């Protein structure tokens, strides 16, 4: 069968609802560093453009020390990486659509602001990694 189409998917909020695990990681960092936790709706408005930007949006003017910001962002990434698929779930209909695309010989790839290794880990843990021919994450193409 000839391949005619390719679909490029975003990951967070398109294929997978990652907000609960992002919130857990964010609030872990806030507790650890003595700051106020956020609610799920707040986290959804902060997400996008990667962990550094998400944490910067959360800090706003509250935290001015760049070293502390970097420590908090590192803690976020470390915690999130260890807990990436605790509550994250496929968005309704995604599994059926991926199966349909595979049957129709549609090639598929993922492009995300997550680092590539976190994206691959999440896709593997939720058991959809094998649908994709390529996963491009933050910094994936830096060496090209």
Can you name each region flagged by the protein language model?
Residues 120, 124, 135-140:
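Anionic-ligand binding region
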Residues 142-144:
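Conserved small/polar residues in nucleotide/adenosyl-binding loops
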Residues 2-95, 100, 104, 115-117, ...:
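N-terminal helical cap/lid subdomain that shapes the substrate entry/recognition surface
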Residues 105-109:
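Short active-site oxyanion
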């Amino acid at each position: 069968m000839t391949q005619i189409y390719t679909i490029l998917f975003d990951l967070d909020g398109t294929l997978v609802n990652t907000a609960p695990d992002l919130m857990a990681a964010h609030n872990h960092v806030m507790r650890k560093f003595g700051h106020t936790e956020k609610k799920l709706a707040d986290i959804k408005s902060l997400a996008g453009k990667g962990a550094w930007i998400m944490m910067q949006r959360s800090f706003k003017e509250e935290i001015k020390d760049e070293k502390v910001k970097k420590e908090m962002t590192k803690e976020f990434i470390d915690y999130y990486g260890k807990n990436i698929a605790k509550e994250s779930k496929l968005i309704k209909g995604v599994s059926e659509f991926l199966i349909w695309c595979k049957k129709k010989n549609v090639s598929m790839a993922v492009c995300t602001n997550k680092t590539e290794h976190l994206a691959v880990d999440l896709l593997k843990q939720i058991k959809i990694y094998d649908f994709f021919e390529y996963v491009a994450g933050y910094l994936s193409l830096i060496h090209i």
